[in-house]
Amino acid sequence: MNLLNKISSVESLRLAWAKLEKFNKESHGLTGETIAEFELNKEDKILSISKRLQEGTYQFSPYRAVLIPKSKGKFRPLQIPEVSDRVVIKAIAIELEEHFKELLEKSRGLSFAYQKGLGVKEAVEKINEYCQNGYSYVLEADLINFFGTVDKDSL
């Protein structure tokens, strides 16, 4: 089974939905459809997404842009996709995580972002461990607006 078939399967999309449905039920994209509203007709919507993915007719919608306040009067731009797009994105993420599992495991201790079970706490613990072993340099990298620059059409 190829990657597109795995991602577009009803089972994969249901799994993706199960991981999304718990979060911020009032969050919405440009159309205003919330997770709670999607949930009311989720089976039909998942079947429709699956069919359109398999037929090659699925189109990502434009994102809703918002500014999240940060400290010192600064703002962080955020792009919020439609709920259906989030289901597809999550299905892709689940499949890619499985596909690259071995590579991700090899990078443990080097990268802590966007990996299940890793976060700031684990990064700080690893930095302390490296310091105790004589290392004295840390590289911190942040790709500004990475997700905003991903070409959705090429996905």
What are these regions (language model features)?
Residues 13, 22, 26, 58-59, ...:
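Intrinsically disordered or highly flexible coil/loop and linker segments, enriched in small
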Residues 1, 14, 33, 47, ...:
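Non-catalytic, well-ordered alpha-helical scaffold segments
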Residues 26-36, 61-87, 104-118:
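Short, conserved non-catalytic motifs in the polymerase core
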Residues 1-47:
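Non-catalytic, polymerase-adjacent accessory regions of viral genome-replication enzymes
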Residues 1-7, 95-152:
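Active-site-proximal segment of RNA-dependent polymerases
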Residues 6-10, 32-43, 82-89, 117-121, ...:
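Generic detection of long, well-ordered alpha-helical segments
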Residues 9-18, 52-73, 87, 94, ...:
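Reverse-transcriptase-like RNA-dependent polymerase core
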